[in-house]
Amino acid sequence: MATRRPGKSYADAAVPGSTPGETPSELSSDTSPAVPMHVIYKLIGFTIAMITTPVGMYFVSVTFGASTTVAGIIAAVMANIILFLYIYVAWQEDKEEREADAARRKGAKAQ
């Protein structure tokens, strides 16, 4: 049979780094989102563009006299353009973050 350790309840053991005398207000709580909101907004925007642009271009092409095959090719090309734009925007954002980290490290070394 398991023995109970004195001074530590199950709730205390479940929270790493907590001691029996700590109150909940003393514990650090990180409620920040895992992903910044501007990243979520970009993802939502590109998702909407990825859905509406190819479908819209397909129907516009068919309406103006193109065959369905040509309209499908145009829709596929537009989907690829939006995908490459998303990759480029994400790459630029990552590049800016790396440059900011390098500047912070350089500033920390100078001090």
Curated annotation (Swiss-Prot):
Q: Does the entry feature the keyword Transmembrane helix, yes or no?
A: yes
- In terms of superkingdom, the source organism counts as Eukaryota
**Region (Disordered) location:** 1-32
Q: Zinc as a keyword?
A: no
A GO biological process of this protein is: vacuolar proton-transporting V-type ATPase complex assembly
Q: Where are the transmembrane segments?
A: 44-64, 70-90
Give the GO cellular component terms, alphabetically: endoplasmic reticulum membrane; endoplasmic reticulum-Golgi intermediate compartment membrane; ER to Golgi transport vesicle membrane
Q: How does it sit in the membrane?
A: Multi-pass membrane protein
> Keywords on this record?
Cytoplasmic vesicle, Endoplasmic reticulum, Membrane, Transmembrane, Transmembrane helix
Localisation: Endoplasmic reticulum membrane; Endoplasmic reticulum-Golgi intermediate compartment membrane; Cytoplasmic vesicle, COPII-coated vesicle membrane
Chain ranges sitting on the Cytoplasmic side read 1-43, 91-111
**Segments on the Lumenal side according to the record's topology features:** 65-69
Q: Where is the composition biased (Polar residues)?
A: 20-32
> Main localisation, per the record?
endoplasmic reticulum
Describe the function of this protein.
Required for the assembly of the V0 complex of the vacuolar ATPase (V-ATPase) in the endoplasmic reticulum.
UniProt lists the family membership as follows: Belongs to the VMA21 family.
Q: What is this protein called?
A: Vacuolar ATPase assembly integral membrane protein vma21
User: What is the organism of origin for this protein?
Assistant: Emericella nidulans (strain FGSC A4 / ATCC 38163 / CBS 112.46 / NRRL 194 / M139) (Aspergillus nidulans)
Q: Which gene encodes it?
A: vma21
